[in-house]
Design a protein with these regions (language model features):
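Charge-dense, helix-prone N-terminal extensions
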Residues: 1-84
């Protein structure tokens, strides 16, 4: 279906590495996935660098995967726990 809005589940905006790590510490063993929001440069909002997000996720056994465009000012990337 062209033009359909995709439901991507629970989203999180973390403005920096510390916010992302705090969320992971509290939720890595309770949640199966989270879609981390990346604001565009044009939005003017602070954003966690991709490499920082991946490094923190790996510390908790999580990996990155799909990216989805949300709107003209943001996208979201799926992070989830690795399969054992």
């Amino acid at each position: 279906m062209l033009g359909a809005v995709m439901n991507i589940g629970e989203k999180l905006y973390a403005s920096d590495r510390k916010d992302w790590r705090r969320w992971l510490e509290a939720n890595f063993n309770r949640e199966k996935e989270i879609w981390l929001i990346y604001p565009s440069k044009e939005s003017g909002k602070p954003r966690i660098p991709y490499n920082d997000a991946v490094e923190e996720a790996l510390c908790f056994g999580w990996i990155d995967s799909n990216v989805r465009h949300l709107d003209e000012y943001s996208s979201a990337q799926r992070f989830s726990s690795r399969k054992p």
